[in-house]
UniProtKB/Swiss-Prot annotation:
Record-annotated membrane-spanning stretches: none
A Pfam family it matches: STIV_B116-like
Alphabetical list of InterPro entries matching this protein: STIV_B116-like, STIV_B116-like_sf
Descriptive protein name: Uncharacterized protein 114
Amino acid sequence: MNKVYLANAFSINMLTKFPTKVVIDKIDRLEFCENIDNEDIINSIGHDSTIQLINSLCGTTFQKNRVEIKLEKEDKLYVVQISQRLEEGKILTLEEILKLYESGKVQFFEIIVD
């Protein structure tokens, strides 16, 4: 059975087999929220403000859950990502991450291992 994950980043270290193909699509908030509202999704986000942002935007009830992701063929990964580099060690508050979202600096992606 294919797995579906939620994360705040994508890394090559998540891939288990090489060579491999990965399809990355930028999606809007609505599509992101529809796809993560799934009881089988494996949440791997370990940042309070990111979880609060997702719950606020999508009406979900995720909790922090810092787990390792290992993607297999046909697995999906939904990513919420800040599109600007933060100061080293910066931990965002909910207000700060909401401000980034409102200014278009938070993006959503669907990643599929092909």
